[in-house]
């Protein structure tokens, strides 16, 4: 579908006029402010690795992330994380695993456990969920890593067998328009892909400004399907399981 609205989208959010990013979702680190003092809060992946090394007693059994075996989103985030910085990612995976890493299927589960004080922090949590929860629960802190913050997007496309393709094209154009994007932000609290869909002090604009060079979008394309290959998927899961195995 050749939409006139795609000219306003970033290059990473469009693939062959077939798939379109509609909103973006940064991956955050969430922590309990009562359990982790401000001077210990890590602002990069390296700082998080250092924290794991320095505070093993405090963090043992009290850190979490997605389970890539139960969560397709977790598989996407972890595999893209491994591509973004393989040395740091696998070092982090081993560090978390040695301390008894909890693995969950949803961001909501992790946020609940961090807020309740059962976890000190959770890694690779969906950013919009974390920010929205932190607004009403002041015990939660949200970190956007300043070395790189992975950003994924919600993707819309028209299937080849769509029963009403003309209506689908109209809906997609609306979804990608300035008004449609503003509605996503205002009514659903999502971060619109279009830079002109909000004000200069909108959540999306402020986040993009704060991240600047650390903003690391996951490009929409055929590469996202790589782990649909079962051999590749199982290879990654085996490597993940080995890296996150707790110390005896």
Model regions: which residues?
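A ligand-binding cleft/hinge motif common to bilobed small-molecule-binding domains
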Residues: 115, 121-139
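Ligand-binding "clamshell"
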Residues: 7-16, 132-144, 206-207
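A bilobed periplasmic-binding-protein/Venus flytrap-type ligand-binding module shared by bacterial periplasmic
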Residues: 28-35, 77-79, 153-164, 183
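Conserved C-terminal helix/tail region of periplasmic/extracytoplasmic solute-binding proteins
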Residues: 217-248
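Extracytoplasmic ligand-binding site segments that recognize negatively charged/polar headgroups
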Residues: 1-115
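Periplasmic-binding protein-like
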Residues: 25, 91-97, 103, 136-160
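Short, hydrophobic alpha-helical packing/hinge segments within bilobed ligand-binding/sensory domains
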Residues: 110-111, 129, 168, 181
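Mature extracytoplasmic/periplasmic domains
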Residues: 159-220
């Amino acid at each position: 579908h050749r939409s006139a609205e795609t000219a306003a989208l970033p290059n990473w959010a469009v693939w062959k006029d077939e798939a379109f990013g509609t909103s973006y979702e940064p991956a955050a680190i969430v922590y309990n402010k009562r359990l982790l003092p401000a001077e210990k809060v890590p602002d990069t992946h390296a700082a998080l690795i250092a924290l794991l090394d320095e505070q093993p007693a405090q963090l043992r059994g009290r850190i979490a992330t997605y389970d890539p075996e139960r969560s397709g989103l977790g598989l996407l985030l972890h595999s893209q994380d491994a591509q973004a910085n393989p040395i740091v990612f696998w070092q982090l995976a081993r560090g978390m695993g040695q301390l008894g890493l909890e693995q969950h299927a949803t961001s909501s589960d992790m946020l609940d456990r961090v807020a309740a004080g059962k976890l000190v922090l959770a890694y690779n949590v969906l950013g919009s969920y974390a920010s929205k929860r932190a607004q009403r629960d002041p015990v939660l802190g949200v970190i956007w890593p300043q070395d790189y913050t992975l950003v994924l997007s919600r993707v819309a496309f028209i299937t080849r067998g769509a029963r009403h393709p003309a209506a689908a094209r109209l809906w997609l154009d609306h979804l990608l328009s300035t008004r449609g994007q503003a509605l996503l932000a205002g009514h659903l609290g999502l971060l619109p892909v279009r830079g002109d869909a909000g004000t200069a002090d909108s959540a999306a604009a402020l986040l993009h400004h704060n991240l600047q060079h650390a903003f690391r979008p996951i490009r929409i394309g055929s590469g996202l399907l790589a782990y649909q290959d079962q051999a590749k998927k199982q290879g990654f899961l085996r490597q993940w399981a080995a890296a996150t195995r707790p110390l005896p």
